[in-house]
């Protein structure tokens, strides 16, 4: 299988299609809107940051783009298609507070989780996946910690491991929620 970025663009058949397009997005918690009428257009190849005070809805917007929270209204497109059809082209680094750091897993296992989109849930990772995970750990300077439990790392080290998990996906889009 080829590069997921070229796959997504080839499927659309349109050069220059937006990487992320959000139109009239509204998200509510218990019938109380927390985001409303949000529009966002992100071209391919752009580094972009969403900044704002605590409680402004940055995390909620990322989660809505990823389908982790349900939108009350609006549309989210990734390379011109619904996110459900484009999951494999999006890498995600969550906020530290949303992860169970006491879950008994190694650094290498966490990074290999980034390969499950390509593998599927029923196939076990093999040598190729381990090599890709180790290469991603090397990119973030964490290869020496591969066999260590994720709970034994500092907060910054944990974030670098989750960055490696996103990188191992070879995604066309990376969404990072307070990555540093």
Kindly label every feature range from the protein language model.
Residues 174-178:
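Catalytic Walker B motif of ABC-type/P-loop ATPase nucleotide-binding domains
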Residues 20, 34-37, 146:
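Conserved structural motif at the start of ABC-family nucleotide-binding domains
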Residues 149-153, 157:
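Conserved ABC ATPase signature
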Residues 74-86:
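Conserved ABC transporter NBD signature motif
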Residues 112, 127-145:
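Conserved ABC ATPase "signature" region
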Residues 66:
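Helix-to-loop junction immediately C-terminal to a conserved catalytic motif
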Residues 51-53:
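The feature captures the beta-strand-to-loop junction immediately N-terminal to the Walker
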């Amino acid at each position: 299988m080829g590069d997921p970025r070229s796959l997504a663009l080839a499927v659309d058949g349109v050069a220059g299609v937006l990487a992320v397009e959000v139109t009239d997005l509204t998200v509510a918690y218990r019938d109380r809107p927390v985001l409303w009428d949000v529009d966002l257009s992100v071209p391919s190849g752009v580094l972009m940051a969403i900044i704002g005070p605590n409680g402004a809805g940055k995390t909620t917007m990322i989660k809505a783009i990823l389908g982790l929270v349900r939108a009350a209204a609006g549309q989210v497109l990734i390379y011109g298609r619904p996110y459900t059809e484009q999951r494999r082209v999006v890498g995600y680094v969550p906020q530290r507070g949303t992860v169970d750091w006491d879950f008994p897993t190694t650094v290498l296992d966490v990074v290999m989780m980034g390969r499950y989109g390509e593998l599927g849930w029923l196939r076990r990772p093999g040598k190729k996946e381990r090599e890709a995970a180790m290469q991603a750990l090397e990119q973030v300077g964490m290869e020496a910690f591969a066999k260590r439990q994720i709970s034994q790392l500092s907060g910054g080290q944990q974030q670098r491991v989750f960055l490696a998990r996103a990188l191992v996906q070879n995604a066309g889009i990376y969404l990072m929620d307070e990555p540093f």
